[in-house]
A protein has these predicted regions:
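N-terminal juxtadomain amphipathic helix
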Residues: 1-64
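A C-terminal cap/extension of S-adenosyl-L-methionine-dependent methyltransferases
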Residues: 11-21, 232-289
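Conserved SAM-binding loop and adjacent beta-strand
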Residues: 66-81
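Conserved SAM-binding loop
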Residues: 77-198, 211-225, 238, 277-286
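Short loop segments at secondary-structure junctions
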Residues: 32-33, 41, 217, 286-289
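Short glycine/proline- and charge-enriched loop/turn segments
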Residues: 63-66, 198-207, 246-253
């Protein structure tokens, strides 16, 4: 489902380096303060853009230097994610991970004593998750069986940008959240320094899998429409480094580790003043709660 009718400003043209090699425009939506990938694939055609050994978010094995960095960073970020969630809730809270992939975060939360389950559209990812621990990750249709106002926390770790109908999904997830509950939403930030540096080669544009590209201003507007508000934000420090590493390959045809480390360092350094980190986690609550 198309979210916007006002894709009214060409911003950049990007290539799908990971899978298809196709070119897509990024158009700035002045009313929403965000970018939209244009044209957007039909929902039925989206899955083909995820069917590649180069697309690693659902992968199990290391095949390259970037894969090794990705898996190492994932371990560190899961610890940080658990820390952010635990700062709001005691053990035993109910956590729904929307877009759970192969279930790493769900299993980690369960190991910490939380009641946690995941929802995931990709059947292969669900099969991997449930082979490690049965009945951990379910098809997204399972959302209809979840009781309203039953979840202490709902997490979307780099998921929102993939959702064709993200506003409808957020509205549905809001109904599942307890009055005192929180949404934890991580998204890339196209206003970051590393995005500006790499331009069309910035790996976090990841067209056309990333249908939307958010700014802090866009996130404030989105949740204001839902009668929710951003309570706080957390920087995802490591994203600047591994996104920069993959971006160097898109830019030059090979990984440039030292350049990636330098650009990642500069991005995080500049963000200490601007707040524009490569990726941000938004902690969102119901207004007046």
């Amino acid at each position: 489902m198309e979210q916007h009718n006002t894709h009214n400003g060409f911003f950049l043209q990007c290539t799908d380096y990971a899978v298809s090699g196709e070119a897509f425009d990024l158009c700035y939506d002045f009313s929403e303060h965000m970018l939209a990938t244009t044209p957007q694939p039909k929902i039925a055609a989206l899955s083909k853009y995820y069917n590649s050994s180069s697309y690693i978010s659902h992968a199990k094995h290391r095949k390259s230097i970037f894969d090794s960095v990705y898996f190492s960073v994932r371990k560190l970020t899961i610890k940080r994610k658990l820390k952010w969630v635990s700062s709001c809730y005691c053990e035993g809270a109910s956590i729904l991970d929307f877009g759970a992939g192969v279930g790493h975060f769900v299993r980690s939360a369960q190991a910490k004593g939380w009641v946690s389950m995941g929802l995931e559209t990709n059947q292969k990812a669900r099969n991997i998750a449930n082979s490690k621990k049965p009945a951990t990750v379910f098809d997204t249709n399972h959302i209809e069986s979840i009781k309203p106002q039953s979840q202490s926390a709902i997490t979307l770790w780099h998921v929102l940008e993939h959702l064709p109908d993200y506003k409808q999904q957020l509205n549905k997830l809001k109904t599942l959240l307890k009055p005192s509950g929180r949404l934890f939403i991580a998204v890339p930030n196209f206003r970051s320094y590393d995005a500006a540096y790499f331009q069309q080669h910035w790996a976090a544009y990841d067209v056309p899998r990333h249908l939307w590209h958010f700014s802090k201003k866009a996130m404030v507007s989105i949740f204001d429409e839902l009668d929710m508000e951003i309570e706080r934000t957390h920087p995802m420090i490591f994203d600047a480094f591994y996104v920069s590493l993959l971006s160097t390959k898109y830019q030059s045809g090979r990984y440039k580790l030292f350049k990636a480390l330098w650009v990642g360092f500069l991005s995080n350094l500049k963000a200490t003043k601007t707040g524009e980190y490569s990726s941000l986690v938004f902690v969102v609550k119901h207004k007046n709660n």
